[in-house]
Design a protein with these regions (language model features):
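Oxidizing extracytosolic/periplasmic lumen-facing domains
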Residues: 1-103
Length: 103
């Protein structure tokens, strides 16, 4: 380890940086779960979802985090979800949470 390495900031994971930026600056819209992938135990681990921005429909896939996996019944096909997307690049999006009846 060189002397200058001590002063360098560790590089942030690009996926973590993207998610943090969308959580800070992204616009919110509603989307719909189209498909849900399950593991051997039947827990939903990944979803395919769609959303529409300015009459253009986008589709994306997201691996659910542990908090989202604990509420797998909220991510069944046809369920409504909240999406955060980049207004300059609407195809860049993340799932914020599932929308329940009580909002």
């Amino acid at each position: 380890m060189s002397f200058l390495d001590r002063f360098r900031r560790p590089k942030e994971d690009p996926e973590v940086a993207r998610r943090n930026r969308l959580l800070r600056e992204g616009r919110i819209t509603e989307g719909c779960v189209m498909e849900a992938t399950q593991d051997i135990q039947g827990n939903v681990t990944q979803i395919l979802y769609s959303y529409e921005i300015n009459s253009v429909e986008y589709e994306s896939v997201e691996i659910l985090n542990n908090d989202q996996r604990s509420r797998t019944s909220a991510y069944v096909p046809g369920a409504t979800i909240l999406i955060r997307y980049d207004p300059r690049q609407p195809g860049n999006s993340i799932v914020v949470k599932a929308v329940t009846g009580d909002r």
